[in-house]
Regions:
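Gly/His-enriched, cation/cofactor- and phosphate-binding structural elements
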Residues: 133
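Histidine-anchored nucleotide/phosphate-binding helix
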Residues: 1-7
């Protein structure tokens, strides 16, 4: 119903699901969501799949869900460790009027010509990289 209701039955819904995922050392019985299954079900803008890694982005994606003039299911995949990670913080300014949802978050590092690789990360991988550096 979640992915096909609009196409099959012309029924829209604004269901919001927060599905924590990732093993994070706990084993497969602790992983409650499979991103790849939802990605396979995405077709013709039938659902919104998000992976909000900051409180501000989570706020904006929920606000956007309520304020839009149409309804689509929103599935937010978030690793459990990000719910309490010390680097996963936002200011009120990032949630204030004039701020918006960011599809991508980027590092504000300076451009260096010797850089030959760029890494795109999701989930809490960026926190591992920042801790490594």
């Amino acid at each position: 119903f979640i992915t096909s209701a609009e196409y099959k039955w012309r029924r829209s819904n604004g269901l919001v699901m927060l599905l924590p995922h990732g093993y994070e050392g706990q084993g497969p019985e602790h992983s409650s969501a499979r991103i790849e299954r939802f990605l396979e079900a995405c077709a013709n803008d039938n659902i919104q799949l998000a992976n909000c890694t900051t409180p501000a982005n989570y706020f904006h994606v929920l606000r956007r869900q309520v304020k839009r003039n149409f309804r689509k299911p929103l599935i937010n995949m978030s690793p459990k460790s990000l719910l309490r990670h010390k680097l996963c913080v936002s200011t009120f300014k990032e949630m204030a009027t004039g701020s918006d949802f960011h599809r991508l978050l980027w590092d504000d590092a300076e451009f260096r010509p010797e850089v030959t690789n760029i890494k795109l990360c999701s989930d809490n991988k960026i926190n591992h990289i920042l801790n490594f550096n």
